[in-house]
Amino acid sequence: MFSWSILFIVCFSLVSAFKDTSPIFLFSTNSKLPKSSDDSSISTCPMMFFDAAIEALSTCNTATLIIHQPGLEVNDFQLGAFKHLKRVSLQSPYSLLLPYSKESLDSQELVHSAKQNCDVEVVYLGGSFNAFPPLQNDRITVVYMNELSNESYHRSAQLMELDEMFYNLQSTLEQDAQWNVIIASSPLNNSDFEGFKVDANEEEANAEFVIQTLGGLNSGKSALQHGQLASLPDQNEGSQTTLAMHQTRKHPVTDNGATGLFTEYQFFTPGLYMGYLALAVLVPTLFISCRLLSSIQISYHAFDSPRRKQL
């Protein structure tokens, strides 16, 4: 009974350790931040990451993009959907990753800190927007994406949309512009994330701001295919304004992915699950075999040759 109690505690600890948490990324061209190395690009302390984000946003004349993607996991980056994001992460002088964060990033506090240091303009957008104003200096763009699906096919499509949307926004930057990119996530159905969602009044005000940014043009008439850029005339300045377009794809939802433990625990893959089952059978078998072998008793003269009978 005592051995079964110990086994239960060990299994419970393993399952708790494999429970999914939310990664947070920071990419920046801020010269004040130290250049990243293999040892300094990964952080395990949320406060260290938050301090680095505050320092990155404290520099004026910098374009900042904050993306909230609920349900994003570390193993999503092994699917090959983030080719543009990976390219930017390799090219950025400073990058920081908080792989396992159980706390949602407070973007409002980051924006408030940036406003205290610089005269910045803040734009809040929802994932349903089909047009985004371009990134520019002294502007913070906060995008709230829709929750990721648990179905593998639909999830892969959403991850590709996120990467393409990021590429479209990043393409609006000037070649010598300084920028910060923060990608935050939160577990699905997390009550703490409810405060980050844009309400109806704020979204309506942001929609009006987008129209003003486009110079009064109707973006619906100039809708582009996904992954393209549009250069639209700005009626206020008479110049060309680059606009990033984003369209939500419509994919059929198919349930051909992993379910159960494989979706709730990010490291609990089918391969590891089969390994655990094999160990559950092999280890007790080996233990019993060793006990049986050790219990075999052989007399001292068992292997002696029989004596010849004397006539």
From Swiss-Prot:
Transmembrane residue ranges: 268-288
Membrane side Lumenal: residue ranges: 18-267
Stretches assigned to the Cytoplasmic side: 289-311
Membrane topology term: Single-pass type I membrane protein
Protein's UniProt keywords contain Aminoacyl-tRNA synthetase: no
Signal sequence annotation: 1-17
GO cellular component term, pick one: endoplasmic reticulum
Residues linked to a glycan: 150, 189
Broad class of the protein's primary localization: endoplasmic reticulum
Top-level taxon of origin: Eukaryota
Subcellular location(s) of the protein: Endoplasmic reticulum membrane; Vacuole membrane
Keyword line: Cell wall biogenesis/degradation, Endoplasmic reticulum, Glycoprotein, Membrane, Signal, Transmembrane, Transmembrane helix, Vacuole
One GO term (biological process): vacuolar proton-transporting V-type ATPase complex assembly
InterPro entries: Big1, VAS1/VOA1_TM
Record has Ribonucleoprotein as a keyword: no
Family: Belongs to the BIG1 family.
Purpose of the protein: Accessory subunit of the V0 complex of vacuolar(H+)-ATPase (V-ATPase), a multisubunit enzyme composed of a peripheral complex (V1) that hydrolyzes ATP and a membrane integral complex (V0) that translocates protons. V-ATPase is responsible for acidifying and maintaining the pH of intracellular compartments.
PANTHER family with a match to the protein in the record: PROTEIN BIG1
Quaternary structure (record): V-ATPase is a heteromultimeric enzyme composed of a peripheral catalytic V1 complex (components A to H) attached to an integral membrane V0 proton pore complex (components: a, c, c', c'', d, e, f and VOA1).
Protein name: Protein big1
Organism: Schizosaccharomyces pombe (strain 972 / ATCC 24843) (Fission yeast)
